[in-house]
Amino acid sequence: MLKDLFKKSKYATVNPSAYKSKVVEEKPNIPSGMWTKCSNCNNMIYYEDLENNKYVCTKCNQHFRISPKERIKQIFDKDTFKEMWKSLKTNNPIDFEDYEEKINQSQSNTGSKEAVVTGVGRINDLEVACAIMDSFFMMGSMGTVVGEKITRIVEYATENNLPILIFTASGGARMQEGIFSLMQMAKISAALARHDEKGLLYITILTDPTTGGVTASFAMEGDIILSEPNTLVGFAGRRVIENTINETLPESFQKSEFLLEKGFIDSIVERKNMRAYLYKILILHGVNKYE
């Protein structure tokens, strides 16, 4: 009997590597790109649902950043937008190291030559000139080509008595082009002043993010300034300001809702309503139907 107490128990033997391989084999095969996570609420969203909802989170209403191509699709009448100066590209004016590689990488990623798309299109048959900045191209930074294209479309609008819409999305002036990028602020503002002298309408639509030299110039010069919800709008970064003034800023600081409260913008418009809202403004300002 005592002998039986000291007998070794019999255990089943498990091969961990065999078990692991079995688990891996049994994982469901989910195609990549089918789901995406909201950066605001961490909700997992079925990509098709996100696309059908104009790239707005179905849970918290966070507006995802979108490309100029998608913006054109949402705002303009089908097949009416005609892009202008598509082939313009930078030539690295100050020979900044690795700049060409970064430009080439952005061109490959986005399929665009630069960080802004300019052209003319129609909203319910009302013709407008438009510039749409691309945050996916070097964070929409403003260099010589971005400045030139926006200036040209503003001048085109002035010559043809058209209203101008600018959808801003930018990290500011492009450091790789030095003083040449900063010059674009004054250049675009001067073109907009000539547009204003003719009594023509300029509408700015601030989208996430709108910062730096773009905010300090043409983004805040619109006759009417609109914004998408929860858009980051500012000049210097939050940490820079806090370190400078030695104070903690409010959580809502530099958000479009904060700017609306302080009177810096006129209205916050959800993406699903933007096309209709712009149409109403154009009608109220006497914009004529396309002929």
Swiss-Prot record:
GO cellular component annotations of the record: acetyl-CoA carboxylase complex
GO BP: any one term: fatty acid biosynthetic process
Pfam families, sorted: Carboxyl_trans, Zn_ribbon_ACC
Enzyme class: transferase
Localization per Swiss-Prot or TrEMBL: Cytoplasm
Pathway(s) served: Lipid metabolism; malonyl-CoA biosynthesis; malonyl-CoA from acetyl-CoA: step 1/1
Keywords: ATP-binding, Cytoplasm, Fatty acid biosynthesis, Fatty acid metabolism, Lipid biosynthesis, Lipid metabolism, Metal-binding, Nucleotide-binding, Transferase, Zinc, Zinc-finger
Gene3D superfamilies (UniProt xref): 2-enoyl-CoA Hydratase, Chain A, domain 1 (3.90.226.10)
Record-listed E.C. numbers: 2.1.3.15
ZnF region ranges: C4-type: 38-60
Annotated residues for binding of Zn(2+): 38, 41, 57, 60
Domain called CoA carboxyltransferase N-terminal: residue spans: 34-291
Similarity comment text for this entry: Belongs to the AccD/PCCB family.
PANTHER family per the UniProt record, alphabetical: ACETYL-COENZYME A CARBOXYLASE CARBOXYL TRANSFERASE SUBUNIT BETA, CHLOROPLASTIC
Entry function: Component of the acetyl coenzyme A carboxylase (ACC) complex. Biotin carboxylase (BC) catalyzes the carboxylation of biotin on its carrier protein (BCCP) and then the CO(2) group is transferred by the transcarboxylase to acetyl-CoA to form malonyl-CoA.
Protein name, per record: Acetyl-coenzyme A carboxylase carboxyl transferase subunit beta
Organism of origin: Clostridium botulinum (strain Eklund 17B / Type B)
Lineage: Bacteria, Bacillati, Bacillota, Clostridia, Eubacteriales
